[in-house]
Every structure is written in structure tokens, then in C-alpha cells.
Amino acid sequence: MKEHDLINMEGIVTESLPNAMFRVFLDNGCHVLTHISGKIRRNYIRILPGDRVKVELSIYDLTKGRILYRIRNEASKDTL
């Protein structure tokens, strides 16, 4: 995929699913099914429900995405 075929958004992890999958509630009000990126997996970054994350979505399927970055809790003031 090309760089301009992707949409970056922020959201809150609402549910942790098996196989490093997560359900994320985006800022625009949509729920998406996401998986974690390779760098997050390689660096053992733990993502828990309630964490604020940056998500990358494809313009071809807006129901699935990839978690790129976990925003630290001190910087995040949002709650479920």
C-alpha cells in the first residue's frame, strides 16, 4: 500500500482479543478491529483496555486497522 492510501487516527482500546487483536473506539465514533504493528510486538509494549493509541486504517477497509503507537497515560486524559 502507498503512504497516501492510509488514514491515521487516534482512539481508545475498549477490548483485548486473542492473538494480539484489539477493538478500538476511534475519536470519530467508530469501532474498528485492530492488530499491533511489528515494532510494538518486537519491543514487548503492552497494550491494555483504556490505553489511548494511534491507529492506521486503509481507505479500502475502514473496519480493520493497525496500532502504530501507544500514547502514555500521563499524556492521555481520556477515560472510557
Swiss-Prot record:
Which keywords label this protein? Chloroplast, Initiation factor, Plastid, Protein biosynthesis, RNA-binding, rRNA-binding
User: According to its UniProt record, where is this protein located?
Assistant: Plastid, Chloroplast
Highest taxon of the lineage: Eukaryota
Residues annotated as signal peptide: none
Q: Name one GO molecular function term.
A: ribosome binding
GO CC annotations?
Answer: chloroplast; cytosol
Domain (S1-like): residue spans on this chain:
1-72
Keyword match Methyltransferase: no
Please tell me where this protein is predominantly located: plastid
Similarity comment: Belongs to the IF-1 family.
NCBIfam families on file:
infA
Q: How does it assemble?
A: Component of the 30S ribosomal translation pre-initiation complex which assembles on the 30S ribosome in the order IF-2 and IF-3, IF-1 and N-formylmethionyl-tRNA(fMet); mRNA recruitment can occur at any time during PIC assembly.
PANTHER family named in the record: TRANSLATION INITIATION FACTOR IF-1, CHLOROPLASTIC (PTHR33370:SF1)
Q: What does this protein do?
A: One of the essential components for the initiation of protein synthesis. Stabilizes the binding of IF-2 and IF-3 on the 30S subunit to which N-formylmethionyl-tRNA(fMet) subsequently binds. Helps modulate mRNA selection, yielding the 30S pre-initiation complex (PIC). Upon addition of the 50S ribosomal subunit IF-1, IF-2 and IF-3 are released leaving the mature 70S translation initiation complex.
Q: What is this protein called?
A: Translation initiation factor IF-1, chloroplastic
Species this chain originates from: Psilotum nudum
For this protein's source organism, the top of the classification is: Eukaryota, Viridiplantae, Streptophyta, Embryophyta, Tracheophyta
